[in-house]
């Protein structure tokens, strides 16, 4: 809640008070992360509000299946961005790219497309597409949206900033044959994933 309160104060010049509901425990919840390497190839994370890379040998907020300790023991090339994710099926993807240029990261290990299931609806997510990093977030967010949206058969919905189709996947069955869901997304990668997810 401190981050949100700070952003409202800094950007919107408004004072807000929030109550944040904790979802799951404080450790082992992240399914994806972006790390960087030092010039010498040590894996770590950027210091807050800085470009300084702090080598880290373990990160307890990550799901154990990401095997961060094993990754931190590798000898990496210097000045790399390392993006790692784990799917619902347990497949780990590692994508790398150099931090000193604008070249997009490329998958170096694992599948190019991760598979997730939210309330039994399968979704495919490319490495470049956004996906929630907290393992419970997709479920919790869809439950909250469904509770407040009160979607009925025959409704016409707009899923703005719809990404790969997290909310659309839940809305389709509710609106039924007489309804419609239009997903709007600007990311080429996420749009491609959404087209594949709803083909």
Kindly give the residue locations of the regions a language model identified.
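Accessory RNA-recognition modules of RNA-modification enzymes
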Residues: 1-199
